[in-house]
Amino acid sequence: RDGANVDKLLVCPNGAQHRDYHFTEKPLKPSWTLYLGRIEPRKRQYLYQDIYGVEFVGKYTDTTSFDRNRDCYLGQWEHEYKLQHVTDYGNMMLLSDGENGTPLVIKEALVAGLGVVVSKYAAHDLDTSLPFVTVIPDDKWEDIEYVQMKLIENRKISVTMRKEIRQYGVDNFSWQK
């Protein structure tokens, strides 16, 4: 690529150590979506704060109109807490235009048994034909009713497929494969 000798390239894909992530077949919050990531403009969390059933976790940055005083913002989780509690949710969302490949947080969600609702930029190496992977088209990001409908549809499917989702995550994104 770009003139590099491919025999001397080593690609190290991003992945998650699935054994570190707590997994439950029945989530504690099956009707809730987790939006996990640094609060910043490219991830557009500020657009989705009015959607009931979405909780936001991540380091707050004052570069966006996201209101950190709302009940739906849970602050930043410590790593060990994240490992234990990602599995509590029905699914995860990430609608960002600044991703190069599938972000680690999406792979973590899958190994924890969560379906995902993502942008095409966050779905690089996901099998988008799977019923628990929903890709929101660019022209629908600001259509809050559409996004909410897709979150609900994905959650309903995802909470019934937790074992399959986890297995897909382990088979495709775990360091253990």
Q: Predicted regions: what is each one?
A:
Residues 25-43, 49-55:
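Conserved donor-binding/catalytic core segment of Leloir-type glycosyltransferases
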Residues 87-101, 114:
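Acidic donor-binding loop of glycosyltransferase active sites
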Residues 1-23:
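Donor nucleotide-sugar binding/catalytic pocket of nucleotide-sugar-dependent glycosyltransferases
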Residues 83, 106-111, 125:
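Short alpha-helical segment that forms part of, or immediately flanks, the ligand-binding pocket
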Residues 130-142, 151-155:
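Conserved acidic donor-binding segment of nucleotide-sugar-dependent glycosyltransferases
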Residues 39, 60, 69-88, 97, ...:
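Conserved active-site histidine-acidic residue motif and adjacent donor-binding/catalytic loop
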Residues 106, 115-119:
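Short hydrophobic beta-strand element within catalytic cores of glycosyltransferases
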Residues 139, 155-177:
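A charged, aromatic-enriched C-terminal amphipathic alpha-helix characteristic of glycosyltransferases
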